[in-house]
Structure formats: C-alpha cells, structure tokens
C-alpha cells in the first residue's frame, strides 16, 4: 500500500499550491493596496482576490467532462503548468490589469486541482483507507498555507516588503508538482476501465496494490460502470454444510447457495430468507418512507445500517470479517491464481486485449449438472470459490472488494419447456455480512483463529442452522459473458461517455442533492472569506495590541497569527465523516457566537483581542477538521463512475460560485454591518448546515465506491416508488 499513499500525497501537492496561494494573496494584498492606492476601492481589492475564484469557476465548467475524455492525470499536469505560468506573470505584473490576468490563470490551475485531486485519490485508493488518503488534500492545503504564511511573515519584516516576490515564489513548488504529475503519477484505473483499456488498468492496479493478481478489483471497476439496473436487496442466513452425497461431493439443496472455503472440506450453505427480514440492511430497505413524521432521509438510515454492523475498529485484521476472514478471503480465492489472468492464454488475439476483461471471476463453468458431478470438491476448493444454486442452474464466483463486502456473479439460468437450460443473463451480487452484535436469532457461535466454528442446533432441514446473516445487493451485471464464459466483455456504450440524461437517475439526483447542498452550506459558512481576510480581520480586532511590546508591526503580527492558526488545521477522518461533521459544526457555531459577542461588548483592548483571536483560531481549526474537508471527499465518492466527472463539475461549480459571492462581498459587508454582523450570518448558516447533515447526509466511510452508488440508486428508486404508491392510493 506504500505506493498508493505516495501517489495520493503527490497528487495532493496541487491542493498545497492552492493553500499556498490563499495565504500569499492574503498577505500580499496588504501591500498591493498601498502600491496601487486601493484603500478606498474595496471592490477592486475584492476583485484581485476573487479573480482566481472566477478563473476556477470557468475552468471547472469544462474540467469534469474533459477529464472524462482525456484522463485525470493529463488535467493534473495542465494544472501544474497553469500554476507556474500564473506565478511568473504575477511576479512581473506592472499594473493592476496584468495582476488580474495572472490571478485568472492562477484560478485555472486551482480549479483543476481542487476538482480533480479528490476524484483521482478516490479512484486510485482502496476502500479501507480511501477516507484517510482523501484527507491529504486538506492536510496539504493547510500545510501550504502554514509555510506560505511563515514566508510572507518573514518578508513582511523587511523594510520594503515585495508583494511580487511573495506571489512569485509559487513557481518553485509548481515545478516540483509538474515533475511528479508527468513522471510519477499513474492514470486513474477507473478511468482506464471506462475507456476499455483493461491491460493498462491492470498494470496500474498492480503497481498501486503491490501485488500481481488484481483481477477481483478490476472486475469491480467494470461493474461500477453500470449502476441501479433493477437492484434489489436480498437476505441470506449462512451456516455449516454437513450434507454429502454418496460420491463424497457436497450438493446444495433446492434454493440454497453453496459457499466454498479456502481449505478442503470447508463449505457453507446460504439459504435465502423469505418473509419478514431480520437483517438491519434488508429490513430497513423494506420501508423507505419516514416513519412517525420523521424528517430524516431514509437513505441515511439505510447507509447507517451498514456501519452499525461493521466489526469494531479495534479488531485485528483476521477478525474484521465474521463470514469472510482476512477481509473476505473465504470467497476471494481467485487472488492466488495469478496465472489465470493472462491475456495471451485466454485470448489468442491480443488486439482484443483492451476490449475484454479476461478474468477467472467468470469461470468456464458448464451449465449441465452432470459436468458438475465430474468435478471433485477438492479441486474446486483449490481453483476457485464458487456459488451453486441447486435445481435452478445458477453459478457464480466471488471475490473480496474490501470493507467487509464481496462481489459475486451468478448466471441466472432458467429451465425451458424442453428441459434445457436457457441463459437468463448475468447478475452481480454485492454481499455484506452482519456481525454478532446484530444476531437477532440469538444463535451461539465461537471464533477459532480467523474462522468461525459453527454449532448446529435443532432437527430437520427446515430449521435455521446457520449463525451468520448476510444481505446482498443483486442487479444486472455490467459485464457481458463471452462465448465460453471465460471472457467478460465491456458494454459497448461505455465508451460513448456520460450523458445529461443519466443525471435523471433517482440515485444520481439524490447524490447531487447531497453534494450540492454541502457545497453551498460549506461556502456560506464563511471559511474562505475568513481565510482570505484573516490578517485584516485580526488587525481590525486589535490583535496588534498584544504584540506591540515585541516591536512587530500590525501587518506582520496578523500574518504570524495566521501562520499559527493554519498549523492547527490538521484534518482527521479516522472516525465517521458524518459524525465528525455533526460534532464539529456546533463548535463552529459557538466560536462564531463568541466572536460576535466579543465584537459587540467592550471588555478592553487586550481582552477583546484575545477573544477574537481565540474565536477565529477555533473556528478555522474545527472547520478544516470536519466541514472543510468532508464535502469534497463525499462528492468524490457518491457518484457512479460513468457520470462522476460531470457530477463533480456541477458540485465544483456550486463551490466556486458560492466562493466568489462570499469572497467578493466580504469587504463590503465588513464596512456595512461589521464583523459582528458578518459572523452572525455565518453562525446561522452553520446551524442550518448541522440540520442538513443530520437529516440528509449518509455515512460512506470504508464502503467501495461502486457499492455506495448502488445504495443511492436502490434507496432512491424504492423511496420514490413508495411515495408514488402512497400518492396514488
């Protein structure tokens, strides 16, 4: 995993440059005003700062769709070039107009980085550490601000500080970013899969994961190309298989699925549960309308049912999965068969290599029962992990996809009137196990090593003898089986790119509502307005009175305080993202209210300065820990691969438009209603944001991206269907 961490860190340098720019312009604008005599021109001052935001907004309009066509890596390289060019022009700027043009170029680079870096990291990171890696952009942004504030503070101590040098230093880290983007960063494997470039995607995954066999994850990326096609949630009870036929081969009973373990002789039976569901996932999906007048979105409850049943964080790696030990290795045995993933062996024609997914996951199983009897159980255990449905003819193979999830496929074969089997299509299954904490049947179990030791109870086959419960999202597969079942073909329509009509999908619309809502509330909570003008705000609140005895000017003192503030901006996504926002937003409200009170009540210069400085510091630190980092992370996770670039563009446009409004209007608002009025408005917005997060924002931590999209789709469709049924009734 070391490689994927380094890749995420290198990509996040683009955000470090954004933070660097935010800090330098905040310090440089103090001296820009003096040189160009803008003290009485707050609109021009605001335009100098906001011009980069205008550029970011303009470039964001095209960044998502263009990145879907040319790739994420190419756009990051372009971002580094724009950063460098803008810094050179800012260093040369002879007048305000050239400076405004340079700020526009700078905004182009910022817009590309801020929009695409979270997407890039989400598309390259494994689900188990995706949330942690996605803190890198915010961490690097805060680090860039800290370093830049320190640099600007040092320059401000000179007799004649040069704002051109402050802005021009950006060219140095821009060169480093270009080198890393051009020669170190790989292309996003999900983007490569969406273009049918399977062999390149496999090589990238091998590099990022540090192992040769990545066939399971590669198949997951293919399945992520199609979301929400008649998805249903099914419930299973899984227990020991003690049935044997006369030949020693274990056969499943009717309507049961056999799961083979990693060792010879290990097998389980998965029995579909009919009637009222006892599983949290399946039962909560049963009623998608709010109950008892509750305003909480049922999707929040549906996602929550997954995280309530995840093993505790302090479990060791071998016990994180009750049903699938070692993160799913009971079913994911194909990972040991590196030789099975061989384009030359599976497909003589190498020209079709990019079109086909030559994967053991769709194994060449025969569909006739007699062929199955000819196989020995031991060979089946060693070569693949399979699921068989008796008397129906369904076969499937499965692999672990992280986060306690398994991806499985089954051929939905039907028996025709002539007694022959007819291919009913390929279905995928995202399987998730329940933990002991939610064992509603009170069935005893014990843990032996990393495997479960089952204790059958009762007589007869009609009684539930299993001790592990699981739920599965079942829908039509994106892959299309090849001639003998050895090859999974990519859907032809994938290469045509996303269309606007896909935004009408219920799951995509619901995800857009969450993403756009978070971006609006985040910006109108005032974070960027506060950051851009932190030196001036602290100067106006009287912070210089605390440092006059040190011989430091008011401008330098405010820059020093800003540097110390950014040092505290250490984001933390080691816990639930939803819980982190719900915990930190009240602190934001409290700090803003304290700032308002400190501005209205005269307690003396030193006391007022301390209150204002402490309030701003707490606000910035808590904001970046929660509400500042999470919206971009969440937006990079909740959309399907086929429309991710387009949806991120919509969210990013919302981000930049709101950012422009906040940044451009702040100088005017400070003069008209003062600091107390401005931060009073921000406090009200934060209160609204807390309500929105509580009612509408689900928890996605640790879930594969494809599963997240599937949940949004199935939840939104079923809720819409239920609402339509009630309205018609």
Curated annotation (Swiss-Prot):
<feature type="modified residue" description="Phosphoserine">
    <location>
        <position position="446"/>
    </location>
</feature>
<keyword id="KW-0813">Transport</keyword>
<keyword id="KW-0812">Transmembrane</keyword>
<dbReference type="InterPro" id="IPR003663">
    <property type="entry name" value="Sugar/inositol_transpt"/>
</dbReference>
<comment type="similarity">
    <text>Belongs to the major facilitator superfamily. Sugar transporter (TC 2.A.1.1) family.</text>
</comment>
<feature type="transmembrane region" description="Helical; Name=7">
    <location>
        <begin position="511"/>
        <end position="531"/>
    </location>
</feature>
<feature type="transmembrane region" description="Helical; Name=1">
    <location>
        <begin position="5"/>
        <end position="25"/>
    </location>
</feature>
<feature type="transmembrane region" description="Helical; Name=12">
    <location>
        <begin position="673"/>
        <end position="693"/>
    </location>
</feature>
<feature type="region of interest" description="Disordered">
    <location>
        <begin position="337"/>
        <end position="372"/>
    </location>
</feature>
<dbReference type="GO" id="GO:0022857">
    <property type="term" value="F:transmembrane transporter activity"/>
</dbReference>
<feature type="compositionally biased region" description="Polar residues">
    <location>
        <begin position="356"/>
        <end position="367"/>
    </location>
</feature>
<feature type="transmembrane region" description="Helical; Name=10">
    <location>
        <begin position="610"/>
        <end position="630"/>
    </location>
</feature>
<keyword id="KW-0472">Membrane</keyword>
<comment type="function">
    <text>Sugar proton-coupled antiporter which contributes to vacuolar sugar import (e.g. monosaccharides including glucose,sucrose and fructose), particularly during stress responses (e.g. in response to cold).</text>
</comment>
<feature type="transmembrane region" description="Helical; Name=2">
    <location>
        <begin position="46"/>
        <end position="66"/>
    </location>
</feature>
<keyword id="KW-0926">Vacuole</keyword>
<feature type="transmembrane region" description="Helical; Name=11">
    <location>
        <begin position="650"/>
        <end position="670"/>
    </location>
</feature>
<keyword id="KW-0597">Phosphoprotein</keyword>
<dbReference type="InterPro" id="IPR020846">
    <property type="entry name" value="MFS_dom"/>
</dbReference>
<feature type="transmembrane region" description="Helical; Name=4">
    <location>
        <begin position="104"/>
        <end position="124"/>
    </location>
</feature>
<dbReference type="Pfam" id="PF00083">
    <property type="entry name" value="Sugar_tr"/>
</dbReference>
<keyword id="KW-1133">Transmembrane helix</keyword>
<dbReference type="GO" id="GO:0009705">
    <property type="term" value="C:plant-type vacuole membrane"/>
</dbReference>
<dbReference type="InterPro" id="IPR036259">
    <property type="entry name" value="MFS_trans_sf"/>
</dbReference>
<feature type="transmembrane region" description="Helical; Name=6">
    <location>
        <begin position="165"/>
        <end position="185"/>
    </location>
</feature>
<dbReference type="InterPro" id="IPR005829">
    <property type="entry name" value="Sugar_transporter_CS"/>
</dbReference>
<feature type="transmembrane region" description="Helical; Name=3">
    <location>
        <begin position="81"/>
        <end position="101"/>
    </location>
</feature>
<feature type="transmembrane region" description="Helical; Name=8">
    <location>
        <begin position="557"/>
        <end position="577"/>
    </location>
</feature>
<feature type="transmembrane region" description="Helical; Name=5">
    <location>
        <begin position="135"/>
        <end position="155"/>
    </location>
</feature>
<keyword id="KW-0762">Sugar transport</keyword>
<dbReference type="InterPro" id="IPR050814">
    <property type="entry name" value="Myo-inositol_Transporter"/>
</dbReference>
<feature type="transmembrane region" description="Helical; Name=9">
    <location>
        <begin position="581"/>
        <end position="601"/>
    </location>
</feature>
<dbReference type="InterPro" id="IPR005828">
    <property type="entry name" value="MFS_sugar_transport-like"/>
</dbReference>
<protein>
    <recommendedName>
        <fullName>Monosaccharide-sensing protein 3</fullName>
    </recommendedName>
</protein>
């Amino acid at each position: 995993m070391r490689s994927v961490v380094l890749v995420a860190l290198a990509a996040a340098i683009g955000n470090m440059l954004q933070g660097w720019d935010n800090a330098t312009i905040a310090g440089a604008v103090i001296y820009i005003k003096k040189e160009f005599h803008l003290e009485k021109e707050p609109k021009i001052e605001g335009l100098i700062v906001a011009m980069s935001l205008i550029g970011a907004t303009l470039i964001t309009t095209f960044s998502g769709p263009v990145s879907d066509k040319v790739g994420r890596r190419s756009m990051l390289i372009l971002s580094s070039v724009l950063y460098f060019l803008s810094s050179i022009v800012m260093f040369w700027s002879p007048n305000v107009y050239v400076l405004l043009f340079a700020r526009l170029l700078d905004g182009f680079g910022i817009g590309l980085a801020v929009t695409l870096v979270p997407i890039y990291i989400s598309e390259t990171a494994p689900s188990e550490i995706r949330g942690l890696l996605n803190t890198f952009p915010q961490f690097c942004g805060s680090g860039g601000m800290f370093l830049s504030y320190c640099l600007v503070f040092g320059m401000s101590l000179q007799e004649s500080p040069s704002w051109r040098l402050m802005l021009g230093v950006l060219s140095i880290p821009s060169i480093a970013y270009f080198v890393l983007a051009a020669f170190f960063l790989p292309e996003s494997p999900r983007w490569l899969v969406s273009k049918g470039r399977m062999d390149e995607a496999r090589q990238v995954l091998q590099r990022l994961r540090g192992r040769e066999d990545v066939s399971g994850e590669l198949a997951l990326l293919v399945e992520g190309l199609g979301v929400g096609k008649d998805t249903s949630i099914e419930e299973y009870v899984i227990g020991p298989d003690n049935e044997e036929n006369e030949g020693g081969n274990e056969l499943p009973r009717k309507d049961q699925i056999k799961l083979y373990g990693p060792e010879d002789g290990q097998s389980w039976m998965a029995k579909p549960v009919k009637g009222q569901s006892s599983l949290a996932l399946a039962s909560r999906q049963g009623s998608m309308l709010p109950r008892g007048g509750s305003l909480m979105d049922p999707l929040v409850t549906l996602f929550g049912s997954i995280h309530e049943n995840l093993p505790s964080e302090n479990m060791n790696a071998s016990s994180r999965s009750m049903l699938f030990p070692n993160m799913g290795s009971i079913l994911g045995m194909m990972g040991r068969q590196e030789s099975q993933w061989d384009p030359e062996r599976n497909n003589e024609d190498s020209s079709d290599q990019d079109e086909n997914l030559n994967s053991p996951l769709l194994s060449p199983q025969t569909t006739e029962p007699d062929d199955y009897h000819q196989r020995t159980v031991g060979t089946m255990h060693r070569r693949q992990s399979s699921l068989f449905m008796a008397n129906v003819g369904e076969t499937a193979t499965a692999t672990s996809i992280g986060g306690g999830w398994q991806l499985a496929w089954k051929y939905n074969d039907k028996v025709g009137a002539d007694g022959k089997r007819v291919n009913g299509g390929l279905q995928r299954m995202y399987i998730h196990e329940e933990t002991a904490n939610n064992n509603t049947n009170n069935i005893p179990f014990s843990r032996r090593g990393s495997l479960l030791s089952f204790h059958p109870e009762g007589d007869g086959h009609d009684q539930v003898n299993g001790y592990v419960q699981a739920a599965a999202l079942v829908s039509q597969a994106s892959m299309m089986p090849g001639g003998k079942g050895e090859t999974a073909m990519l859907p032809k329509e994938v290469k045509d790119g996303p269309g606007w009509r896909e935004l009408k999908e219920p799951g995509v619309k619901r995800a857009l509502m969450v993403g756009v809502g978070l971006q609006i509330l985040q910006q109108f909570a005032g974070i960027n307005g506060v950051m851009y003008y932190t030196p001036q705000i602290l100067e106006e609140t009287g912070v210089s009175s605390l440092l006059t005895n040190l011989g430091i000017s008011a401008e330098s003192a405010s820059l020093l305080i800003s540097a110390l503030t950014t040092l505290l901006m250490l984001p933390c996504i080691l816990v639930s993202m939803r819980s982190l926002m719900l915990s930190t937003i009240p602190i934001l409200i409290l700090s803003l209210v304290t700032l308002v009170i400190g501005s209205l009540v005269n307690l003396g210069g030193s006391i007022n300065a301390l209150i204002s400085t402490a309030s701003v510091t707490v606000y910035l630190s808590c904001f970046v820990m929660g509400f500042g980092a999470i919206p971009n992370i969440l937006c990079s996770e909740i959309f399907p691969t086929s429309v991710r670039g387009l949806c991120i563009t919509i969210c990013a446009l919302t981000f930049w438009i709101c950012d422009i409004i906040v940044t451009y209007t702040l100088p005017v608002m400070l003069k008209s209603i003062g600091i107390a009025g401005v931060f009073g408005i921000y406090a009200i917005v934060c209160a609204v944001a807390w309500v929105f997060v509580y009612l509408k924002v689900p928890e996605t931590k640790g879930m594969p991206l494809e599963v997240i999209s599937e949940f949004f789709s199935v939840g939104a469709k079923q809720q819409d269907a239920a609402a339509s049924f009630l309205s018609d009734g």
